[in-house]
Amino acid sequence: MSGVTHRGGDLRSYLSSVACFLTLILAGRVTAQTFAVLHNFSATSSDSYTNWDGAQPYQTGLVLSGTSLYGTTLYGGVNGRGTVFSVNTNGNDFTVLHTFSASQSPDYTNLDGEYPQGGLVLLGDTLYGTTLNGGTNSGGYGTLFSLGTNGTGFTAIQSFDSIPNGSNPNGGLVVSGNKIYGTTQESGATNGFGTVFSVNTDGTGLEVLHTFTVTTTNYPYANEDGGEPDSGLILSGDTLYGTAQFIGPYANGTIFSIKTNGADFTVLHTFTAGIGPYNTNADGAFPRAALVLSCGTLYGTASFGGDYDKGVLFSVSTNGSDFKVLHAFTDLDGGRFNLDGAFPTAPLLLLGNTLYGTANVGGVGGNGTVFSLNTGGSGFTVLHSFAATSFGTNSDGMYPECTLALSGNTLYGTTEQGGAYGNGTVFSLFIPPQLTIIPSGPDVILTWPTNYAGFTLQSTTNLGPSAVWTTNSAGPLVVNGQNAVTNSISGTQTFFRLSQ
C-alpha cells in the first residue's frame, strides 16, 4: 500500500467529482450478509384462525423508532382479525398492542375495524393505520385508526362509507402537520374505483381529493386516470404522488400526482398494454406500491409486465418524463424459481444511490428475495433468497411483501407466510459495506463507508484455497463520509476485500 494521498490533486475534491460522474467498480468479495429471524408468528387454530400474536403480516412495512419496530398482521390475534404489534430490533419484547375485533352480521360492523393491511405511520408517539374492513358504517368498509406506541388510546378516528368517501383503505398513509393523506381501493362514486383523501389527525375534516371513475361500465374497464389504488402516497411540498394499480387507457395502471388541496390531478405515466398470452410489455403493469422520491426522480415497482411479465423496477421524473425500466425480473423455472425474484409488490427503500426492495416470489428457493440496485439500474444484487418450504414452513419465511426499514447497517422486514409455523416472520438482514475502486492515473483509490465499524481492508495476489490475506497497514483517510486508501498499480494482480 502506498499511503492515502491522491497523486495530481486534492483527494477530497477528486472523490466528490468522481462520485457524480464515474460508475464505481465493485472490488473483490465483501463479507456475507447476516440474516436473522426476530419473530415467528405462531400457529393458528384451523377453524377460527386465531392465535396470540397475529398471523400473516401482509403487504405491510415496519415502522422503526429507536430500537422498536411496529407493524400489523392481517389475520390472527385472539379474534382472528389481525393485530398491531411491536418488537425490539434484537427480537426481544414482542408485544401485541391491539387485537382487532370481529365484525357482526348482517352489516359487518364493529367499533375498531378488522384486517389491517396498509401498514403504519408514526407521528410523535402516535401510530396511524387503516383496516380493510369493519367500522361503524353498515357494510364494514374499513377504518382509519390511531393508538399510542405503548398500546394505549386506541381510537377508530374514521369509518369509511363507500360513497362518497371510498371503501377498503388498503395503502399506507402519509402525515404532514395535522393532516393525513391516503387512498381507498374501492368506491367513492357509483362507478368509482377508489379515492385519494385527506383527513385531520383527530378524524375530522375528511375530504375526497380525487375519485377514480370509469368510462365503461363493463369489463375491461377503461379511463384516463387509473383505478383501485393499492398503495400509499408520498408528499413533496404541496404535491402528492401515487400509483393506481388497474384501469387507465390500457388497463395496466398509472402513476399520478395531485395537489394536497385536490387540484391539478395529473397522470404522469400510463402503463402500456400487454402483448401476447403472457401479457409482456416494455414498462410493466399493475403498480401496487408507493413511490420513493429523490432529486426530482420517482422510483417504484410494477408487480407484473416487463420482458417476462414478472414485474419491473422503474424510475420517472416528477413531471412524467424520462420513464426508465431499471430492472425487469426474469422468467420463472417451473413457475417458481429464478435468480432475481419476481412480482415486486412493495415500495423501494432509497439510501444514497442505492435502492433496496423485495420480490414476492422467485429466487433460488422460490419464495422471494431481498435485493439492491443502483438508482441508475446497474448493480442488481440479491441480498437474500428465502428458502424452500416444506408443508408451508421453513427457516426464514416466504413471500416478503413488505417495505423495508433501515437502522444503521441493518434492514428489517416481514414475510407474509413461512417461518416455523407458516404464518410469517419478522426478520433482519445486516448489509456489509460495499468496497469500490476508483481508477486514478497510476493508482486506484479504494473506498468504503465510514459508518461500518470494525472492518479492515485486506489484499491478496491469490484467490485460491491457500490465499493469504494481508491487512492494510496504513490507516484510511476519511473523505466525504468514506474511508479512502490509495494503492499504486503494479504488475501483479491484486484482490481486495473488507474483513471484520
Where are these regions (language model features)?
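Short, composition-biased motifs enriched in small/polar/acidic residues
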Residues: 5-9, 13-15, 431-500
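Extracellular beta-propeller repeat domains
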Residues: 2-443
